[in-house]
Amino acid sequence: MPKVLYKSSEVDNLVKFEFVEIAKPVFESLEIKEKEGKVYDIESQISNLKEELQLLRDEKLQLEEELAKRQELAKEEVQIESKRLIEEAKAKANEVLEAAKQEADLLQKEAIYKKESIETESNAEIERLAREYEEKLKTDLEIAIAKGREEGYSKGYESGFEDFDKVMRKLHVIIASLIAERKGILESSSGQIVSLVMQIAIKVIKRITDSQKDIVLENVNEVLKRVKDKTQITIRVNLDDLDIVRHKKSDFISRFDIIENLEIIEDPNIGKGGCIIETNFGEIDARISSQLDKIEEKFKNFSLLS
């Protein structure tokens, strides 16, 4: 179709009378294209950032799940390790108790043997003295009888009878003296036996407390079991036992709900392995020396009854 060229005034008239409509330019400017390009780039970056954000969220979720699994695994491992340590502690405590029981049996057997030995020695001494006095009595009696024969049968018989009566009275006195002496020997040896037993016990306890560092923990546990009401607790121990007891502080608090507040201090007057526990209601003495005093008292009572 041939193109028709119009002058500008003619074009204006045609537009004016709506015979012609001038359309907008079909070509966009370079500036608009650049802006649209920038908008596209921004939208692309936003899309990429959204994808990266989603990836980070997914990664965070995976990390949280992995962390939860690790925490659960660690919890199980802690429970297993705690159970193992408790079993070890129980086994060690049983070993210590068994060793102490064996030592106590040995001490008792040694004490009985010592007592029987002393009784045997004292009986032998009494028998020896009795034999000596018996021989002397026989000799005196024979002399008296011989003398009586020399002075006449009748007179000698009476004299011999009187001498025999004197000898018998003397024999009764000697026997009473021997019985009293035997009783004195047994009473004096009883103290020696108790002293010997306690010396051996002290050596045994010292050897056990030196080799078994957690004896003090067993003592603390046993005392805390005897506390029935909620209270503030102060545990006093030897300096050598201070660290091991403080290390178990949280364990004591979790195991014994009677503890309102727990303090652990050093006391130079307490021997290794022992403790004194103070509460709002008084103190409980679990020192090794105090326990040995009770054992000594029981041995003394046993001796007196025997």
From Swiss-Prot:
<keyword id="KW-0813">Transport</keyword>
<dbReference type="GO" id="GO:0005829">
    <property type="term" value="C:cytosol"/>
</dbReference>
<dbReference type="GO" id="GO:0044781">
    <property type="term" value="P:bacterial-type flagellum organization"/>
</dbReference>
<comment type="function">
    <text>Needed for flagellar regrowth and assembly.</text>
</comment>
<dbReference type="InterPro" id="IPR018035">
    <property type="entry name" value="Flagellar_FliH/T3SS_HrpE"/>
</dbReference>
<dbReference type="InterPro" id="IPR051472">
    <property type="entry name" value="T3SS_Stator/FliH"/>
</dbReference>
<keyword id="KW-1006">Bacterial flagellum protein export</keyword>
<protein>
    <recommendedName>
        <fullName>Flagellar assembly protein FliH</fullName>
    </recommendedName>
</protein>
<keyword id="KW-0653">Protein transport</keyword>
<keyword id="KW-1005">Bacterial flagellum biogenesis</keyword>
<comment type="similarity">
    <text>Belongs to the FliH family.</text>
</comment>
<dbReference type="Pfam" id="PF02108">
    <property type="entry name" value="FliH"/>
</dbReference>
<dbReference type="GO" id="GO:0015031">
    <property type="term" value="P:protein transport"/>
</dbReference>
<keyword id="KW-0963">Cytoplasm</keyword>
